[in-house]
Amino acid sequence: MKTLKSYYKLSGILLSSLFLTMSCTKDFTELNTNPAGVTDEEAMGDFALVASFLAQGQRAILSENVGEYQVSNNLTSDAYGGYFGAEAPFVGNANNLTYSLVPGWYSSLWVDRYIRAMNPLFRVELMTRNDEKMKDIFAFAKILKVSAMHRTSDKVGPIIYSKYNAPDESDQIHYDNQEDAYKNFFKDLDTATTILKTYKGKEVSAAMKKSDLAYTSNNYDRWLRIANTLRLRLALRVAFKDAALAKTEGEKALNPENGGLLESTADNCFIKLSTDHPLNIITTTWSDTRMHASIESFLGGYKDPRMEKLFEKATDPAVKGQYKGIRTGIDIDAKSRYDNYSKLLPLPNKMQLMVASESWFLKAEAALRGWSNAGDAKSNYENGIDRSFEMYGLSAAATAYKNNSSDKPMPYIDPKAIKAGQNDINAGSPFLSTITIAWNEADSKDRKLERIITQKWISMFPDGDEAWAEYRRSGYPILFPVVVNYSNNTIPTNPGIRRMPYPEREYNSNSAAVNEAVKMLGGPDNGGTRLWWDSTNKKL
């Protein structure tokens, strides 16, 4: 069995399925001077090797591998973020959803991001960093690396990032604390945007055309916008913890001289997959996931027309003809109990990385905070709704929706609960949001923030990583807590799980470094410890 530590050094592990003829070496010096064990001519050629590495990196940001997606996304962030519930009582119902965290599941997340994302993207950086003709590819790899690794840090905290491929004299690979990791993300985005600004208006290179799995035109402009929108996302992520850093980075993203943000649905970033979307397989082939009760409450209460674009109506006789979701962390005795609740409608074989509606909601919050070049909060908020409705072909319904000042999330009733009423969220519950849709200038800043985040959450579906991160960061949207908590008092039922632990194999092979990382956390390595940016003070 490979140790996790070997994944932090460029030994080519688990890439052989793509690169069967690629020779590898464990010599650190050689790897830094001659990455992947090939000559410059072999590496560049018709760009096939670079494109293959970049394809693997792009598809690993959210993992197109269905097994890994299920345990590292669908049974963690997709559920904790209020998008999906599981109808199966995995591991005797003592699993991630009931806060009895399964080591093999969170180990999959950790390994996947380093093998399939960080490893190939770092290789591309080494292969292109000194080649003036490949600067666009170098910048592209930087953006993808930040896209993948911020999601990793947002799940666990301190990560191996700036010290990747740099073992110490004891062969330990050390972590960045989360604050330093974020600052390094911003530095990498600085590098990428500085380069891509010089490519604006230029013909897209053959290497970029071959490597980009999202866009077929205006590639440089759109990836520059992705980088700026990503910077704004990360700036707001730290805003409750380090307001000065957030403002500096956020205003850099908002400065129009830096290339702009995602604006139109044509800018939406979806990565083409080599197989069916993992959520389709998990939903239909495996029958393991259904609509979450929280998103049922919001979409149903708002009479949101996007509901019918996302989910099927339930076929269970108890709720037939309704849209019906499952709460996370409930008593489940058999898969058949909830198997006929609402399924996700089939998704195309492409993975949503970032959409323009998110950009407008980010700008709305930035305006609420008074950041330069953020514009007007109300206009940005309504533009976010417009872009989301447009994405689903519902533009004609957007105006009435934006003007709806009365509808609120609806109570949740589960007629199939093992114990009647156990899973219900009734009117007046503190876990039932009362936020309406229409912008109200008279509301407090905190109320406005709840409105912005709630609509952003709906618009980002099905990106559970961002849903869960924003919920922990801001406290919004107001989601239903677990009913059953098997964490042995290590994870609070309210406000819920805060992170995933480090894998056991990391303790076995990189013990000094991971123990140092746990000290950086400021708490035990369990699901109840808050991340650096997860401030207890969430008031604007």
Which functions belong to the PLM regions below?
Residues 1, 24-27, 57, 146, ...:
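Terminal processing/anchoring signals of secreted or surface-associated proteins
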Residues 1-22:
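Sec-dependent bacterial lipoprotein signal peptides
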Residues 33-35, 340-341, 428-433:
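Short acidic (Asp/Glu) and glycine-rich catalytic loops that position anionic groups and cofactors
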Residues 69-73, 310-313, 396-397, 464-473:
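Short coil/turn segments at secondary-structure boundaries
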Residues 86-144, 148-397, 441-450, 455:
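Structured, solvent-exposed acidic/aromatic patches
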